[in-house]
Swiss-Prot record:
GO terms for cellular component: cytoplasm; nucleus. The gene is HAM1. SUPFAM superfamilies: ITPase-like. Keywords: Cytoplasm, Hydrolase, Magnesium, Manganese, Metal-binding, Nucleotide metabolism, Nucleotide-binding, Nucleus. It comes from Candida albicans (strain SC5314 / ATCC MYA-2876). InterPro entries: ITPase, ITPase-like_fam, RdgB/HAM1. This is Inosine triphosphate pyrophosphatase.
């Protein structure tokens, strides 16, 4: 049985990955901050560790590849890393991979105000996972995209920009959705579905 370390210090992100990727025995409502030994995908056991990694600028693919390679060296084994971006179509996909810094600097209200002068409120949520088997190994990329629009903040604001993103075909923001619903349509789900298929094929 091989072990893959999901590298994150974000408890909310970890819970979603548990709910989507790990075994059906895992309760997605669990408040645990670490994965149990029952979390298996095919021949792999998924564990988790928080690792301080240098942040680089570039496309989301470049950022993910760098993060996976750096994490594999620290862990000295197979790792799974994730990078998420939110792109406003009116801004040619900005903030993109820099969304975390936008949230920290101008907040959710500031992000909504960026689009005040634009009719086009459409946006895309992009999740990119990188899997690396170990130091100096090739990084495999798995990406999921969910289209939607930017709206005034609705719902809990404790998970990034979830409260201002309303996916197409729904009247609720990510933050307002039941977790099971969100985890069946989100950009993270779509990317992890590809990760799962890959791991099961190994």
């Amino acid at each position: 049985m091989s072990t893959i370390t999901f590298v994150t210090g974000n408890a909310n992100k970890l819970k979603e990955v548990i709910a989507i990727l790990a075994s059906s025995e895992t309760d997605s409502s669990s408040s645990s901050s670490s994965l149990s030994s029952s979390n298996k995908v095919g021949k792999f056991t998924i564990t988790n560790q928080s690792v301080d990694l240098d942040e680089v600028q570039g496309t989301i693919e470049q950022v993910t590849i760098h993060k996976a390679q750096a994490a594999a060296k620290v862990i000295d084994g197979p790792v799974l890393v994730e990078d998420t971006c939110l792109g406003f179509n009116a801004f040619n996909d900005l903030p993109g991979p820099y969304i975390k810094w936008f949230v920290q600097s101008i907040g959710l209200t500031g992000l909504v105000k960026m689009l005040i002068g634009f009719e086009d409120k459409s946006a895309k949520a992009i999740c990119t996972f990188g899997y690396c088997e170990g130091p100096d190994k090739e990084v495999k990329i798995f990406q999921g995209i969910t289209e939607g629009k930017i709206v005034d903040s609705r719902g809990p604001t404790n998970f990034g920009w979830d409260s201002i993103f309303q996916p197409n075909g729904f009247e609720q923001t990510y933050a307002e959705m039941d977790k099971k619903v969100k985890n069946s349509i989100s950009h993270r789900y779509k990317a992890l579905d590809k990760v799962r298929d890959y791991l099961l094929s190994q």
